[in-house]
Amino acid sequence: MEKYIGLMSGTSLDGVDAVIVETNGTTINLLGHADYPMDPQLKADLLAVCTGQQTNLKVIGEIDHRLGHLFAEATLHLLSTLNIASSDITAIGSHGQTVFHSPDAEYPFTMQLGDSNIIAAKTGIDTVADFRRKDMALGGQGAPLVPAFHNTLFGKPESTNVILNIGGISNISILQKDSPVIGYDTGPGNMLMDSWITEHKGESYDKDGAWARSGQIIDELLNQLKTHDYFARPYPKSTGRELFNLDWFAQYIENKPYQPQDVQATLLEFTVTTIVDQVIRFQVGNDTKLLVCGGGAHNQFLMERLQYHLPNWAVSTTNDYNVDSDNMEAMAFAWLAHQRIHGLPSNEPDVTGASRYASLGVIYPAN
């Protein structure tokens, strides 16, 4: 068993999730984790790039540099907290910060910032990054990548297991006995809810969904939001902030007398029902499980609404299966680093649409 570090900064832009795991590729144990905050100014600068308000190459290059230092500092903080030497770590798997993902364009591309040369040089640890573009070079979406890891953890169930990750975007992995893994992004997760509460209350997220719970669902608005053509597209598919953001959302609420808390309730229901519309297709009998991870697993009202819409499902978090729901994605990128170091496949072509299996990622040596 070797030790790997996983670094994840998702579409919620709420900081760096850092983990150390021990793995041989088939078994993975979480040894420890740390959350490392992102400077508010860096978050604001990133949001400007992600929403297209800032396209200056000099600014983007500087953010790439700043993020490299942030990820390196998160790594050193984690090692110090757990009293583990950098020499004990085989490699770091760094997802980077996605600022644009365009898999369906004439010239498909994805862009993650966070200079891995800086991470490797500053920590003294070989770093694996740029996980998505090899899959895209093979005709895939480059996302989601986590279903391959979910299959390692939860694969071959007797009944159907649906692993639901709710970060800024929601994605699902469908695990069924004797069937290929299915996985794709269902649509928004916390992203729109977080943006809305930040704009109206100055808070970074809606704790427990309390503000959404205080509102009433606006059916007219909900139905309009669900007309987005993304939801009718067949999988494999993936999405991000470039499709679902407040600028896109503004067209539906302009000059409407909606109360902010009612809009929040509707955004939560938008997330829930676009998830449910997808997962219900994979129900088998009355023994289907929905295992939730990511930040959305802490939103009590959201979890209640999922159970409401899926009365015959067992809805729980992955914590109930001894897998930390907060660190699933960071653990996945530690595992992806292991796969790359050993030249093992780490994508699921049935999930991403790639033409074949491949070992994803580029190695940035420390020396």
Curated annotation (Swiss-Prot):
<dbReference type="GO" id="GO:0016773">
    <property type="term" value="F:phosphotransferase activity, alcohol group as acceptor"/>
</dbReference>
<keyword id="KW-0067">ATP-binding</keyword>
<comment type="function">
    <text>Catalyzes the specific phosphorylation of 1,6-anhydro-N-acetylmuramic acid (anhMurNAc) with the simultaneous cleavage of the 1,6-anhydro ring, generating MurNAc-6-P. Is required for the utilization of anhMurNAc either imported from the medium or derived from its own cell wall murein, and thus plays a role in cell wall recycling.</text>
</comment>
<keyword id="KW-0808">Transferase</keyword>
<keyword id="KW-0547">Nucleotide-binding</keyword>
<feature type="binding site">
    <location>
        <begin position="10"/>
        <end position="17"/>
    </location>
    <ligand>
        <name>ATP</name>
    </ligand>
</feature>
<comment type="pathway">
    <text>Amino-sugar metabolism; 1,6-anhydro-N-acetylmuramate degradation.</text>
</comment>
<dbReference type="InterPro" id="IPR005338">
    <property type="entry name" value="Anhydro_N_Ac-Mur_kinase"/>
</dbReference>
<dbReference type="GO" id="GO:0006040">
    <property type="term" value="P:amino sugar metabolic process"/>
</dbReference>
<keyword id="KW-0418">Kinase</keyword>
<dbReference type="GO" id="GO:0016301">
    <property type="term" value="F:kinase activity"/>
</dbReference>
<dbReference type="InterPro" id="IPR043129">
    <property type="entry name" value="ATPase_NBD"/>
</dbReference>
<comment type="pathway">
    <text>Cell wall biogenesis; peptidoglycan recycling.</text>
</comment>
<dbReference type="Pfam" id="PF03702">
    <property type="entry name" value="AnmK"/>
</dbReference>
<comment type="similarity">
    <text>Belongs to the anhydro-N-acetylmuramic acid kinase family.</text>
</comment>
<dbReference type="GO" id="GO:0009254">
    <property type="term" value="P:peptidoglycan turnover"/>
</dbReference>
<keyword id="KW-0119">Carbohydrate metabolism</keyword>
<dbReference type="GO" id="GO:0005524">
    <property type="term" value="F:ATP binding"/>
</dbReference>
<protein>
    <recommendedName>
        <fullName>Anhydro-N-acetylmuramic acid kinase</fullName>
        <ecNumber>2.7.1.170</ecNumber>
    </recommendedName>
</protein>
<dbReference type="GO" id="GO:0097175">
    <property type="term" value="P:1,6-anhydro-N-acetyl-beta-muramic acid catabolic process"/>
</dbReference>
